[in-house]
Protein backbone atom coordinates (compact mmCIF):
# COMPACT_ATOMS: atom_id res chain seq x y z
CA UNK A 1 0.00 0.00 0.00
CA UNK A 2 1.51 3.33 -1.02
CA UNK A 3 0.98 6.55 0.80
CA UNK A 4 0.58 9.89 -0.87
CA UNK A 5 2.56 11.76 1.75
CA UNK A 6 6.10 10.62 2.30
CA UNK A 7 8.90 12.46 4.04
CA UNK A 8 10.28 13.91 0.80
CA UNK A 9 7.03 15.64 -0.14
CA UNK A 10 6.55 17.45 3.16
CA UNK A 11 8.02 20.94 3.31
CA UNK A 12 9.84 21.67 6.55
CA UNK A 13 8.36 24.57 8.47
CA UNK A 14 9.82 27.96 7.65
CA UNK A 15 11.03 30.51 10.13
CA UNK A 16 8.48 33.35 10.55
CA UNK A 17 10.61 35.82 8.57
CA UNK A 18 10.90 33.31 5.71
CA UNK A 19 7.16 32.63 5.83
CA UNK A 20 6.50 36.37 5.62
CA UNK A 21 8.86 36.68 2.65
CA UNK A 22 7.13 33.73 0.99
CA UNK A 23 3.75 35.42 1.40
CA UNK A 24 5.11 38.71 0.08
CA UNK A 25 6.66 37.00 -2.95
CA UNK A 26 3.27 35.53 -3.83
CA UNK A 27 1.81 39.02 -3.73
CA UNK A 28 4.81 40.42 -5.61
CA UNK A 29 4.23 38.01 -8.50
CA UNK A 30 0.57 39.07 -8.62
CA UNK A 31 1.25 42.80 -8.54
CA UNK A 32 4.05 42.65 -11.09
CA UNK A 33 1.95 40.62 -13.49
CA UNK A 34 -0.88 43.11 -13.00
CA UNK A 35 1.49 46.01 -13.67
CA UNK A 36 2.30 44.39 -17.00
CA UNK A 37 -1.18 43.20 -18.01
CA UNK A 38 -3.28 46.16 -16.83
CA UNK A 39 -0.83 48.81 -17.99
CA UNK A 40 -0.72 47.22 -21.43
CA UNK A 41 -4.52 46.93 -21.64
CA UNK A 42 -5.04 50.52 -20.53
CA UNK A 43 -2.41 51.74 -23.00
CA UNK A 44 -4.11 49.82 -25.81
CA UNK A 45 -7.46 51.41 -24.90
CA UNK A 46 -5.94 54.88 -24.91
CA UNK A 47 -4.24 54.39 -28.27
CA UNK A 48 -1.92 57.28 -29.05
CA UNK A 49 -2.95 59.45 -26.09
CA UNK A 50 -0.02 60.62 -23.93
CA UNK A 51 -0.97 58.51 -20.87
CA UNK A 52 -0.47 55.38 -22.99
CA UNK A 53 3.29 55.92 -23.21
CA UNK A 54 3.60 56.26 -19.43
CA UNK A 55 1.67 53.00 -19.00
CA UNK A 56 3.81 51.18 -21.56
CA UNK A 57 6.97 52.21 -19.69
CA UNK A 58 5.63 50.63 -16.49
CA UNK A 59 4.64 47.47 -18.39
CA UNK A 60 8.13 47.22 -19.91
CA UNK A 61 9.74 47.59 -16.48
CA UNK A 62 7.43 44.90 -15.06
CA UNK A 63 8.29 42.52 -17.90
CA UNK A 64 12.00 43.07 -17.34
CA UNK A 65 11.78 42.66 -13.57
CA UNK A 66 9.75 39.44 -13.65
CA UNK A 67 12.73 37.30 -14.68
CA UNK A 68 14.78 38.63 -11.79
CA UNK A 69 11.91 38.10 -9.38
CA UNK A 70 11.60 34.47 -10.51
CA UNK A 71 15.34 33.94 -9.91
CA UNK A 72 15.18 35.60 -6.49
CA UNK A 73 12.17 33.48 -5.50
CA UNK A 74 13.72 30.22 -6.67
CA UNK A 75 17.02 30.99 -4.89
CA UNK A 76 15.04 31.32 -1.66
CA UNK A 77 12.94 28.19 -2.19
CA UNK A 78 9.83 30.17 -3.12
CA UNK A 79 9.31 28.77 -6.62
CA UNK A 80 5.72 27.87 -5.73
CA UNK A 81 4.86 31.56 -5.30
CA UNK A 82 4.34 31.79 -9.04
CA UNK A 83 1.08 29.94 -8.45
CA UNK A 84 -0.15 33.23 -7.03
CA UNK A 85 -0.16 34.55 -10.56
CA UNK A 86 -3.18 32.32 -11.21
CA UNK A 87 -5.21 34.15 -8.60
CA UNK A 88 -4.12 37.47 -10.05
CA UNK A 89 -5.09 36.25 -13.52
CA UNK A 90 -8.58 35.43 -12.31
CA UNK A 91 -9.06 38.97 -10.98
CA UNK A 92 -7.57 40.43 -14.16
CA UNK A 93 -10.02 38.47 -16.29
CA UNK A 94 -12.92 39.65 -14.14
CA UNK A 95 -11.76 43.23 -14.42
CA UNK A 96 -11.25 43.01 -18.17
CA UNK A 97 -14.44 41.09 -18.78
CA UNK A 98 -16.87 43.05 -16.67
CA UNK A 99 -15.62 45.80 -14.41
CA UNK A 100 -13.84 47.82 -17.08
CA UNK A 101 -17.05 47.88 -19.12
CA UNK A 102 -18.83 49.56 -16.23
CA UNK A 103 -16.35 52.29 -15.37
CA UNK A 104 -14.99 55.26 -17.25
CA UNK A 105 -11.57 55.33 -18.88
CA UNK A 106 -10.38 57.82 -16.30
CA UNK A 107 -11.48 55.65 -13.37
CA UNK A 108 -10.01 52.53 -14.96
CA UNK A 109 -6.73 54.43 -15.37
CA UNK A 110 -6.80 55.42 -11.69
CA UNK A 111 -7.50 51.81 -10.66
CA UNK A 112 -4.45 50.75 -12.66
CA UNK A 113 -2.41 53.49 -10.98
CA UNK A 114 -3.66 52.31 -7.58
CA UNK A 115 -2.41 48.81 -8.40
CA UNK A 116 1.00 50.23 -9.30
CA UNK A 117 1.19 52.03 -5.97
CA UNK A 118 0.18 48.83 -4.19
CA UNK A 119 3.00 47.02 -5.99
CA UNK A 120 5.48 49.62 -4.78
CA UNK A 121 4.28 49.07 -1.21
CA UNK A 122 4.73 45.32 -1.62
CA UNK A 123 8.31 45.84 -2.81
CA UNK A 124 8.96 48.18 0.13
CA UNK A 125 7.65 45.49 2.48
CA UNK A 126 9.87 42.86 0.85
CA UNK A 127 12.84 45.20 1.25
CA UNK A 128 12.13 45.80 4.95
CA UNK A 129 11.75 42.07 5.65
CA UNK A 130 14.88 41.30 3.61
CA UNK A 131 16.82 43.87 5.63
CA UNK A 132 15.53 42.36 8.88
CA UNK A 133 16.59 38.91 7.66
CA UNK A 134 20.02 40.12 6.54
CA UNK A 135 19.26 39.30 2.89
CA UNK A 136 21.38 42.00 1.26
CA UNK A 137 20.88 40.73 -2.29
CA UNK A 138 17.10 40.90 -2.04
CA UNK A 139 17.18 44.24 -0.26
CA UNK A 140 19.43 45.67 -2.98
CA UNK A 141 17.14 44.36 -5.72
CA UNK A 142 14.14 46.01 -4.05
CA UNK A 143 15.93 49.34 -3.67
CA UNK A 144 17.02 49.32 -7.33
CA UNK A 145 13.52 48.29 -8.44
CA UNK A 146 11.99 51.15 -6.46
CA UNK A 147 14.48 53.66 -7.89
CA UNK A 148 13.43 52.65 -11.41
CA UNK A 149 9.69 52.16 -10.84
CA UNK A 150 8.91 55.23 -8.71
CA UNK A 151 9.58 57.81 -11.46
CA UNK A 152 7.56 55.72 -13.92
CA UNK A 153 4.57 55.61 -11.56
CA UNK A 154 4.96 59.33 -10.91
CA UNK A 155 4.75 59.86 -14.66
CA UNK A 156 1.56 57.78 -14.84
CA UNK A 157 0.12 59.91 -12.01
CA UNK A 158 1.09 63.14 -13.78
CA UNK A 159 -0.84 61.99 -16.85
CA UNK A 160 -4.09 62.23 -14.86
CA UNK A 161 -4.03 65.85 -16.05
CA UNK A 162 -4.62 64.59 -19.60
CA UNK A 163 -8.06 63.33 -18.56
CA UNK A 164 -8.93 66.78 -17.17
CA UNK A 165 -8.04 68.31 -20.54
CA UNK A 166 -9.98 65.60 -22.41
CA UNK A 167 -13.20 65.06 -20.44
CA UNK A 168 -15.06 63.33 -23.29
CA UNK A 169 -12.37 60.65 -23.48
CA UNK A 170 -12.22 60.48 -19.69
CA UNK A 171 -15.93 59.69 -19.46
CA UNK A 172 -15.95 56.98 -22.12
CA UNK A 173 -16.38 53.42 -20.92
CA UNK A 174 -13.21 51.41 -20.70
CA UNK A 175 -14.03 49.59 -23.92
CA UNK A 176 -16.20 52.06 -25.72
CA UNK A 177 -19.70 53.40 -25.44
CA UNK A 178 -21.40 50.38 -23.81
CA UNK A 179 -24.12 52.55 -22.24
CA UNK A 180 -25.17 53.94 -25.62
CA UNK A 181 -25.18 50.46 -27.13
CA UNK A 182 -27.25 49.09 -24.26
CA UNK A 183 -29.72 52.00 -24.51
CA UNK A 184 -29.98 51.42 -28.25
CA UNK A 185 -30.59 47.71 -27.76
CA UNK A 186 -33.34 48.48 -25.25
CA UNK A 187 -34.90 51.06 -27.56
CA UNK A 188 -34.04 53.88 -25.17
CA UNK A 189 -31.46 55.68 -27.29
Predicted regions and their residues:
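Acidic/histidine-rich alpha-helical segments that form the ligand environment
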Residues: 24-40, 90-141
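Disorder-to-helix initiation segments
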Residues: 2-28, 35, 51, 101, ...
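Conserved alpha-helical segments that form or flank metal/cofactor-binding pockets of metalloenzymes
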Residues: 49-88, 156-159
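Alpha-helical scaffold segments that form or flank carboxylate-/histidine-based iron centers
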Residues: 17-28, 47-68, 108-112, 136-149
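A positional/architectural concept
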Residues: 39-43, 47
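Preference for long, well-ordered alpha-helical segments
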Residues: 112-189
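Carboxylate-rich helix-loop segments that flank metal/cofactor sites and access channels
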Residues: 2-8, 71-111, 172-184
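A structural signal for well-ordered alpha-helices, especially hydrophobic packing surfaces
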Residues: 36, 63-73, 94-98, 120-123, ...
Amino acid sequence: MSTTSDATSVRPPREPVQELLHTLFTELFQTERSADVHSTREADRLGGAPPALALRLVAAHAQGAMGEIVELAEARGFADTRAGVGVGSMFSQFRDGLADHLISRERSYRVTLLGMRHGMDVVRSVRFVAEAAGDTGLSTFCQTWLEHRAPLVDRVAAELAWFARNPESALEGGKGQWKARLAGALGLG
